[in-house]
Regions:
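Phosphate-binding site of ATP-dependent enzymes
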Residues: 1-73, 85-90, 95-98
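C-terminal active-site "lid" helix and adjoining low-complexity regulatory extension at the edge
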Residues: 71-81, 85-136
């Protein structure tokens, strides 16, 4: 599974984890250590294995989400995430992704790079709101 951490409309990082829920449990049983998910490996937003997913999230899917929900970009959570499974490879053999869920609460732990992205989003929103309030 790939967790795409978002701050507003920008990717703040990725978490990559082997999920074992869809494979038969080991002989030791479903509660055994062998049946538990693998560790979540955190990556920054520039991690090369996830750049196609980043482009899809920032350039296509998040703008579609904003349009579908009829909200502005500033209405997106400061920190949220979307979980993906790998889909079938495309005709060129590149990865595709299947959305599992979107989380807008309990989105921690986060990659080391994410706090800076979150702070930047908060700063931009505060400055935007400060400017909007100055017009009143």
């Amino acid at each position: 599974m790939i967790r795409c951490y978002m701050s507003g409309s920008k990717v703040a990082g990725f978490g990559h984890q082997l999920i074992k829920a869809l494979i038969p449990p080991p002989p030791e049983g479903p509660d055994s250590p062998q049946a538990q998910p693998g560790p979540r490996i955190m990556h920054g937003p520039d991690a090369s294995p996830f750049q196609s997913l980043r482009r899809l999230m920032e350039d296509s899917w998040t703008p579609q989400l904003i349009e579908t929900l009829a909200i502005d970009e500033a209405s997106l959570p400061v920190i949220w995430d979307a979980d993906f499974l790998y889909g079938p490879p495309d005709p060129d053999g590149a990865d595709t992704y299947v959305l599992c869920e979107i989380n807008a609460s309990s989105c921690f732990a986060i990659p080391d790079e994410a706090p800076a992205a979150i702070a930047q989003t908060v700063k931009q929103r505060m400055l935007h709101n400060q400017g909007a309030n100055a017009d009143r």
